[in-house]
Design a protein with these regions (language model features):
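Cytoplasmic helix-loop-helix junction between adjacent transmembrane helices
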Residues: 108-145
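Helix-to-loop junctions at the C-terminal end of transmembrane segments
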Residues: 64-75, 276-287, 373
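Residue-level signature of mid-helix packing/kink "hotspots" within the transmembrane helices
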Residues: 57-65, 149-150, 269-277, 359-363
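Juxtamembrane intracellular "pre-TM" segments in multi-pass secondary transporters
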Residues: 1-11, 191-228
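Short amphipathic helix-loop junctions that connect adjacent transmembrane helices
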Residues: 34-47, 244-259
Length: 408
């Protein structure tokens, strides 16, 4: 893969998309490793933190489907600016949170706003990528967001664990999101089809669900949509478990420091960022189906080992291997999902559905993982292994039907 001839340098729209995603990922991720610690500092128990993070995910899931319709109506760029604008207020709001209840409400609203931004983000990406290098394009898009997130999470964790200053991290997050909004407003183009579609808005809106049902019935896209939804669910389920519970697991089970747990979350994002383009490129070369299968094998093997290993050095090596497997799985997922961008009559519904599944995984994960953690702290990664195996079995059942037809 020649970097100089890479699609990110040959397609301007994709470059601008990647810049804004890096900026947003960097800014937003100041909060990711410190939110559980922030809630804990307010006196919330692990179980309550899990429930709050679950409601955050519920809010994110509930807003995605309707936001897909809104994105079609007002344009993805405008919806992205509005959602980012509201999100920029969230980190700043934590500095005024005078009670546990207020902090929890802010976090739940934050989840709903993330859900609003998701369909618009997918829509902008689907019209910014190179059709001939779809996997590579989505790989770079994922990479810049998670690379920015890795750096942001590391800085946020350092500020809190070493300086003990939550407010400073929240201020930086808000300012960074505002800068992302400015870039989106200046550099991201409006969708070209907006005016043409508005002439038949009633017809398109009224037939969207009907078109999806018809597509499922006659073109057999349902297995692919269900499979993509299941994989998206798994990805955010495991990510949500690690973000919400690992800060406690690392200290209480592995005997590591709080800063180590922040580093692991940052490494999670860093691995995604560095290897997502490779994963996207390889999914173009070997095919999505084969890459999904190999990724599941790596993930399941790693989770099996992580379920009983307690030594920090070996644990760190194996969890990085797991991160690699998850990265390649996500790259294949994004490659397959964004092919629905060629189906304008159903793309927003499909993006919204898969995004809602992803958010549902994040919603369920904290409450499930906190329950398992309270039951037995050592069961955490065993539970993640069982979850991954269930989705892997779903893949084995559906993959023939899911990949039997082409979208374009």
């Amino acid at each position: 893969m020649n970097i100089k001839n890479s699609v990110i340098f040959t397609k301007k729209e994709l470059l601008y998309f990647c810049i804004q995603r890096f900026a947003f990922g960097f800014s937003y991720s100041f909060m990711i490793p410190i939110i559980p610690l922030f809630f804990n500092s307010l006196g919330l128990s692990t179980l309550v933190i899990g429930r709050v993070m679950s409601l955050h995910g519920v809010g994110k899931a509930l807003t995605q489907m309707p936001s897909g319709v809104v994105s079609d109506k007002i344009g993805d760029k405008l919806l992205l600016i509005i959602s980012y604008g509201l999100l920029s207020c969230m980190p700043f709001s934590y500095t005024f949170a005078s009670s546990k209840v207020m902090a929890c409400i802010i976090y739940i609203i934050q989840g709903a706003l993330l859900g609003i931004s998701a369909p618009a983000t997918f829509s902008v990406l689907s019209r910014s990528l190179d059709e001939n290098k779809r996997g590579e394009s989505t790989g770079y898009a994922s990479a810049v967001f998670t690379l920015g997130g890795a750096v942001g999470a590391l800085i946020g964790g350092f500020i809190v664990t070493k300086l003990g200053n939550y407010n400073f991290a929240f201020y930086l997050s808000s300012v960074g999101i505002v800068l992302s909004i400015i870039f989106v407003a200046i550099k991201i183009k409006k969708p070209e089809t907006k005016v043409r579609k508005s002439n038949k808005s009633k017809d398109s809106q009224g037939s969207s669900i009907k078109d999806v049902i018809k597509t499922k019935k006659y073109n057999k896209f349902a297995p692919k949509i269900i499979l993509l939804g299941a994989i998206a669910f798994l990805g955010d389920f495991i990510y949500g478990c690690i973000v919400s519970i690992f800060p406690f697991y690392g200290q209480e089970v592995l005997g590591a420091s709080a800063f180590y747990t922040c580093i692991i979350i940052s490494v999670y994002l860093f691995v995604f960022g560095v290897f997502a383009p490779v994963g996207g490129w390889s999914s173009d070369k070997i095919g999505v189906k084969k890459q999904l299968f190999l990724s599941f094998i790596v993930m399941n093997s790693s989770l099996f080992l992580l379920s009983f290993i307690r030594g920090i050095i070996v644990f760190t090596i194996i969890i990085i291997v797991y991160f690699l497997g998850a990265t390649f799985l996500n790259s294949a997922l994004q490659n397959s999902l964004l092919k629905f961008g060629d189906k304008p009559e159903i793309k927003s519904i499909v993006f919204g559905f898969v995004g809602a599944c992803e958010s549902l995984g994040y919603a369920v994960s904290p409450i499930v993982s906190s329950f398992v953690y309270e039951l037995n702290k050592r069961y955490l990664f065993g539970m993640l292994l069982v979850s991954s195996l269930i989705v892997f079995i779903t893949f084995l059942i559906l993959y023939k039907k899911a990949f039997s037809l082409k979208l374009s």
